[in-house]
């Protein structure tokens, strides 16, 4: 539970609008969806006075670091990502480089803050494992810079969607 984590960690929560544009979306609705995501998180109990909540695209260093991390990330690692394979099947008409390198941007989102504990659902564990691998490769090449982030799984690591077939999504 993110609200409880605020008592144990210095928490940073990112509204990931760049991740959201890797699949089809309506640009004219994005601002509304960003505000809605912020409102939902605050309504769920995240206190902006006790944690940081921000919009990914407002911090250009996220994409700058992602670009640098791309240079140490083997293509084969990205090709094996389960979520890329699943999303590619769901969005056949829009399989793009952003979707392919999504995990590298996610790693940048974590590593830019030297994140050590990352709350994720079980479907994201593979992404955290890749993030650790990217951090290690970067550290070997450029010197000790990033920690090895570890996933923190919730008590309910996967919440099913209303259709009972797929997981619930918090996508913008």
Q: Predicted regions span which residues?
A:
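N-terminal Rossmann-like or analogous alpha/beta NTP/dinucleotide-binding catalytic cores
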Residues: 1-108
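Active-site cores that bind ATP or allylic diphosphates and position pyrophosphate for catalysis
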Residues: 85-172
């Amino acid at each position: 539970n993110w609200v409880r984590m605020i008592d144990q960690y210095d928490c940073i929560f990112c509204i990931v609008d760049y991740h959201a544009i890797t699949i089809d979306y309506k640009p004219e609705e994005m601002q509304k969806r960003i505000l809605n995501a912020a409102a939902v998180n605050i309504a769920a109990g995240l206190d902006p006075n006790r944690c940081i909540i921000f919009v990914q695209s407002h911090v250009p260093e996220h994409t700058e670091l992602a670009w640098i991390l791309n240079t140490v990330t083997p293509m084969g690692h990205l090709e094996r990502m389960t979520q890329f394979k699943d999303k590619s099947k769901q969005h056949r008409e829009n399989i793009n480089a952003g979707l392919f390198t999504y995990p590298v941007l996610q790693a940048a989102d974590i590593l830019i803050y030297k994140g050590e504990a990352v709350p994720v659902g079980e479907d994201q564990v593979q992404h955290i494992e890749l993030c650790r691998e990217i951090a290690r490769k970067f550290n070997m090449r450029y010197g000790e810079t990033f920690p090895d982030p570890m996933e923190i799984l919730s008590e309910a690591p996967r919440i099913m969607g209303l259709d009972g077939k797929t997981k619930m999504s918090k996508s913008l």
